[in-house]
Amino acid sequence: MDATFPSQHNITARPAPGRIRREQCKLAKRLRRQVGQAIADFGMIEANDKIMVCLSGGKDSYTLLDMLLQLRAKAPVPFELTAVNLDQKQPGFPKHVLPEYLSSIGVPYHIIEQDTYSVVTRVVPEGKTLCALCSRMRRGALYAYAETQGFTKIALGHHRDDMVATFFMNLFHHAKLSGMPPKLRSDNGKHVVIRPLAYVSETDIIAYADAREFPIIPCNLCGSQENLQRKQVGVMLKAWEKEYPGRIEQIARALGNIRPSQLADQSLFDFLALGRHSNTPLPNAHAWLAGDLANDTAP
């Protein structure tokens, strides 16, 4: 009997284990380089910093903690890391996952228990997104804990794509050119917030989290809401990236390459002084429009 071979169309090529390991090592090295570069560029970590790493149980915060642990092993300055999670009392939240994981890797941690879930679901009208209020309450709880424990820095897991998306959300919905900075001082002036994943793409984080097999905890509070503005912007950016590969990276670079004289913000550039040949006060808009205003008729 002749041997029967499978159709070419039924054969699925699988990468060799050695190749997979090499690709994973290259990915980890790239992430370490990008995180280390961001830390250096923005002065995120100083000697003897006591850093609170906000761990939600999502891919971003797991990757953040993992990268900081790897970099700390060979860092030029000593610093401490403590993972902190806010248990918002969401129904079905697997409380055992984070303690078991953090204990297994020997990372000090603390779980803050605060029922923000009931407050948010009670206060926000049905059909409205919960993210804004949830974020404010979560931030308040984390900041309060950081203050009581004397943390010098608060590390968040926002990545490059988050920062680009925030820029467009502010552009589209608030008419302003602002985004999500890699490092900032909190509104109350008491905390320094850092985002070490500022140079890392979401695609790489997804691949890294998958390779490391982190015990991901989905967000059932806001993750299932399909009408979020951020998701809409995300769809737009992914479409751009698919049609024009590298576009998100170009936009991210542009956020650090501002030319105030090429925009129109008078607080950043003195347009009034440009080309002036005398010190005579310039007429204001009312003076320029005086003729039109005089001819206006009352409604």
From Swiss-Prot:
Question: Where does it primarily localize?
Answer: cytoplasm
- The EC number of this protein is 2.8.1.-
Gene Ontology MF terms in the entry: 4 iron, 4 sulfur cluster binding; ATP binding; magnesium ion binding; sulfurtransferase activity; tRNA binding
Q: Which cofactor does it need?
A: Mg(2+); [4Fe-4S] cluster
Q: Which InterPro entries match?
A: Rossmann-like_a/b/a_fold (IPR014729), TilS/TtcA_N (IPR011063), tRNA_Cyd_32_2_STrfase (IPR012089), tRNA_thiolation_TtcA_Ctu1 (IPR035107)
Which reactions does this protein catalyse? Answer: cytidine(32) in tRNA + S-sulfanyl-L-cysteinyl-[cysteine desulfurase] + AH2 + ATP = 2-thiocytidine(32) in tRNA + L-cysteinyl-[cysteine desulfurase] + A + AMP + diphosphate + H(+)
Query: What keywords appear on the UniProt entry?
Result: 4Fe-4S, ATP-binding, Cytoplasm, Iron, Iron-sulfur, Magnesium, Metal-binding, Nucleotide-binding, RNA-binding, Transferase, tRNA processing, tRNA-binding
Cellular localisation: Cytoplasm
Key word Iron present: yes
Q: Where do we find the motif PP-loop motif here?
A: 56-61
GO cellular component annotations of the record: cytoplasm
Binding annotation for [4Fe-4S] cluster: C131, C134, C222
Q: Where are the transmembrane segments?
A: none
Give me any GO biological process, just one: tRNA thio-modification
How does the cofactor attach, per the note? Binds 1 [4Fe-4S] cluster per subunit. The cluster is chelated by three Cys residues, the fourth Fe has a free coordination site that may bind a sulfur atom transferred from the persulfide of IscS.
Give the metabolic or biological pathway: tRNA modification
Domain of life from the UniProt record: Bacteria
Q: What miscellaneous comment appears in this entry?
A: The thiolation reaction likely consists of two steps: a first activation step by ATP to form an adenylated intermediate of the target base of tRNA, and a second nucleophilic substitution step of the sulfur (S) atom supplied by the hydrosulfide attached to the Fe-S cluster.
Q: Which family does it belong to?
A: Belongs to the TtcA family.
Q: What role does this protein play?
A: Catalyzes the ATP-dependent 2-thiolation of cytidine in position 32 of tRNA, to form 2-thiocytidine (s(2)C32). The sulfur atoms are provided by the cysteine/cysteine desulfurase (IscS) system.
Kindly provide the name given to this protein in its UniProt entry.
tRNA-cytidine(32) 2-sulfurtransferase
Give the organism, scientific name.
Xylella fastidiosa (strain Temecula1 / ATCC 700964)
Gene of origin?
A: ttcA
